[in-house]
Amino acid sequence: MNKTPCTESGAAPQQPETSAFHAMLSRMRYIPRWSLMRCTRSENLSEHTAETAQLAHTLCCVNNVLFGGDARADRVAAAALYHDAPEIITGDLPTPVKYRSAEMKEAYRQIERQAQKELLDMLPEPLRPALRPALLGEGLTETERRLLKAADRLSAIIKCLTEQASGNNEFDTACRQQTEALAAMQCPEADWFVQTMLPAYRCTLDELTGR
């Protein structure tokens, strides 16, 4: 019969404190994006987060290799993984609502900060200093923040292109607005991506594989 191991004093060892942090993160898959839009395929927050992290990492590499920059790709990608984590608690507030007024935008920002704090507090205390920078997006340079924001917009544009490729004109205006907003950022790394990588998103699988 298995026995519970005991300490030298004979008492059973103390069970480690449990944490809900990653269980909460896993709930991203249940949070839909584009909730006010008619979609041919739904997209959840987990998918968007993973794609944004990939894009952010690539943009940082472009910054370093092609434009002589010094963006920290690993740190930016980690921040991208958590950039929408507060929406686990707040939900994905539609953009027209979030930015309806300056007061609404500021109110949502405060709610977002509170949600970030709640998530951080779910971590075991010794881990909080290590994960805090990624979870709160702290310690990024202005360039790194710009690249992360550009990656977020690129993910939205890619979603629009995917919907348009399926014949869904519901995303025509959103695609134009997101594309204009990205161009207004004057981000050469994103401009390079748009010219070099984005056209392939309109291709079929056979075209992508050269069949």
Where are these regions (language model features)?
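Alpha-helical, largely C-terminal catalytic domains
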Residues: 1-211
